[in-house]
Amino acid sequence: LDRTNKKAAGPGFFDFSMGLRGNIPEFFLSLHREYGDVVRCPIPFFPPLYILNHPDHIRHVLSLKASNYPREDFISRRFQAVFGNGSVSATGDAWARQRKIINPAFQRKFLERSFHVLDKLSRGLVESWKIKAEKREPVEVVSEMRNLTMDMLWEVLFNFSPKNLRHEIYRPVELGVSYIGTPIPLFISRWMPTPTNWQFYFENRKLERILKDRIAERRKSVGSTDDLLDFLLRYKDPKSGFPLSEQAMLEELKTLAPAGYLTTGASLAWLFYLLGRHPEHIGKLNEECRSVKDTAFSYAHFDSLPYTLGCIYETLRLYPTGWSLWRSASEEDTIDDFRIEKGATMVCSPYTAHRHPDFWSAPETFNPSRDFSSNMGHTYFPFGLGPRRCVGENLAMVELMMIVPMLFRHFRFSVLPGPEVQMDHRVILSPVPSLNIQLETI
């Protein structure tokens, strides 16, 4: 094949490395404005890093030629080292095998069995917030949403409430995220005997013990529930007939657990942040949520709550939790007439693509009335694209469409004075440090 020698424009290594010390999503956005859809960033002694901002180029890497761009970049290897070799982080044949195992557990029909659990926990939060509203107590939304989605995920996974174990569950995840998000070029191995690494090791052992205890406990009553752990315990390899090993289950659960609650919890917190900045949308959201009968959740809610869905879509557009998707070029390629070297690191950025002025009018504006129908899967992909598209997308959307109407049926809110919300862009995009709101019952 003929290859072009045309080289994409981009910053020098010094400017690039300095930019990584600040707000990286906004830095990538500034690089897009300055250098265009394909940005080349040199790294001494290594193949270059490319930032892709155009939806077509991102689709090329994640979907059309996905086999040429495996998850073998250094960020993905860090994720695997921290969270195990489950379907979220595995590569190659191991990933294909585990993804095939886990896919049925996240299909719509299977998830319907969990609706009553999600409904119960959403209503429990409403009752808790009613008490706080009556007492005029502030609510810290970031931690509240993280705790709610953690509770939901663990009940869906294990039929088990983690409320008394939240710190033990969250602490190793927090330390792992800090390690994964260490900026280039600080290539610090997790196995180096640093105080942080030792702390992660011991905290991670605690989490593994919690998971192993749940697996051992549930082995005694296989088939008694319809949750994900029961699904994994009942699984038999279609060729060998062998069940999953405990280690394989542990690896899967270690990756699904943090990915499942951190992302959805952050999306809910971003929704409150955006509505707090644009309070003119709260009344319309309240009105729509109260117009629908307070019945058990079903997929029909997606059609009966269009403005609510628009608020969620806009939140995921502006603050996609998977804001950068990393791959490695296994072979030389060409993108937009630019040569892509073998071994190059490819960063596909939904954060910048969702703000691309060629596809989005007033891209920085929060507009729940946007028409997303023509953008789905092409210029809008908060859950990724291609074969590695987020396996938990259906569960995340069900949680969002259950929690948001439940809360805004009962409450309006205002944001209280506090520190300015910033973006924590390590691994997923989360608001930090906190967001305090004052609730008012309707």
What does each model-identified segment do?
Residues 1-7, 71-76, 94, 110-266, ...:
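Cytochrome P450 heme-thiolate monooxygenase catalytic core
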Residues 18-36, 209, 213, 296-336, ...:
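Conserved cytochrome P450 K-helix E-x-x-R motif and the immediately C-terminal K′/meander segment
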Residues 97, 254, 259, 296-300, ...:
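Cytochrome P450 heme-thiolate "Cys pocket" and heme-binding signature region
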Residues 222-226, 286-305, 318-338, 353, ...:
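Cytochrome P450 fold signature focused on the C-terminal beta-domain
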Residues 261-282, 286-288, 393-411:
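Cytochrome P450 catalytic-core helices
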Residues 285, 315, 340-343, 366, ...:
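Hydrophobic, well-ordered secondary-structure elements that form the walls
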Residues 348-374:
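Conserved cytochrome P450 K-helix/beta-meander segment immediately N-terminal to the heme-binding cysteine loop
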